[in-house]
Amino acid sequence: MKITRFAPVALALALAAAGCSLESTDAAPAGTVKVVVGYQSKTINTVTAGTLLKAQGYLEQRLQKITDGGGAKYQVEWQDYDTGAPITAQMVAEKIDIGSMGDYPLLINGSRTQANERARTELVSITGYNPKGALNMVVVPNDSPARSLTDLAGQKISASVGSAGHGTLVQALSRAGIDPAKGVEVLNQQPQVGATALESHQVSALSQFVAWPGLLVQQNKAKLLYDGAELNVPTFHGVVARRAYAADHPEVLQAFLAAQLDATAFLNEKPFEAADLVAKGSGLPQEVVYLYNGPGGTSFDTTLKANLIAAFKDDVNYLKSIGDFADLDIDAFVEDGPLRKAFAETGRGDYDATLASGVNPSKVTGTDPICAVAVSDPALAGEVWVDGADKPQPAANPGCLLRAVQAAKAQGKTIRAVYVPDAELGTRWFADKAIWLREGTQYLPFTTQAAADRYRGSHPTAAPVSYEQAVTEVRG
């Protein structure tokens, strides 16, 4: 893969500065323990260790309990970045104590920090994951003729090298028969820079992590070309802590993990309210936040599952494909002891039972008000968000969902967003941005044209239909 790079020193400086918002405080007063938390407000499947955690004050509350019990005083400093790379740079410099980032950046974090015992990190929890890889996607301009990833051969693609979005691109290109080393030119850009490059047609595609693909599509600035779920490889974001800091202040790490469990429980129990808080804290539209963090989207589960760690081990070769990185012993890097202790101390369920579960803790439930049936199948269930409603209304299947939209429009109501799972891969997506097919009386939504084409290949009677047409013609 031809990669347009900065010089190493310039790159390091750029990563350390890019998209960094520091809520910096003065040095902690004598007798006060300071903890610096690096997070990514716009990488919204990390919110239980960042944006939502901060908004709810769970960490500060947990630390205050220690103080009230006769312990030390604590000071929390939050540092917001656009990607995981600058968080790693700050951890190498021993300036961030706890950070969150995606799976590929976590590999780099573990590799880069292990040379210095004071900087050395360990993976202590997961924030959110998708079992198939749907958290990373490739988008193209709306007027792009590309129908599948193979159409990008020889083109320029924007990605943040070392990010989860870039890692997915490398795997996807290989599977598509495109040589990742020579078949495309990757421009190493921060997400917002890449978004601008895509809009101005300086690049043919953008490969990024949440929430960028959904944001650009929701803003009508791009369309989805490749759904990372096609890889059928788990992707996740997680939390790393500096081992030296955790050894010096084990109570802080325990408080952080307990607070993360608090945030995770809140999000899974009240996803719509959580999306509002995250939208306000990140500056992202609530419709985009709820796309990824709503029921049936990202699985917010803190446990270090075997399938996630197995996929993580398979990703190690990625390190060597992008530069000179030291090998990383994943088994030594992963440490579940503190999280197990947090589960036991908080009473938030049984760790081993949660570890063994592969079910998304948050799914669409309730009674479909249009079809008057219970919503029971996550592979079909969607939601219709009518402006002014207390929360989105559930739909049992795509047909019921289209009827709900039809009814709302007939009543003159404004629809904020409609969410539906992809018929092939199950990825939660915007219904009005999906590719729809009609087969008899059945309506099938797909995230990408390639997915719809695959379906039509084995179902020749399925016919393309626009979302607007489907809403107009659907019948009970």
Residue ranges with predicted function:
Residues 1-9:
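Bacterial N-terminal signal peptides that target proteins for export
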Residues 368-371:
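Short cysteine-rich clusters marking metal-coordination/redox-active sites
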Residues 186, 192-281, 399, 407-426:
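Pocket-lining segment of extracytoplasmic ligand-binding domains
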Residues 44, 249-326:
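Secondary-structure end/capping motifs
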Residues 28-179, 185-188, 204, 233:
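Short, glycine-/small- and polar/acidic-enriched structural segments
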Residues 320-365:
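Conserved C-terminal helix/tail region of periplasmic/extracytoplasmic solute-binding proteins
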Residues 20-24:
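Bacterial signal peptide processing site
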Residues 14-19:
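C-terminal motif of bacterial Sec signal peptides marking the signal peptidase cleavage site
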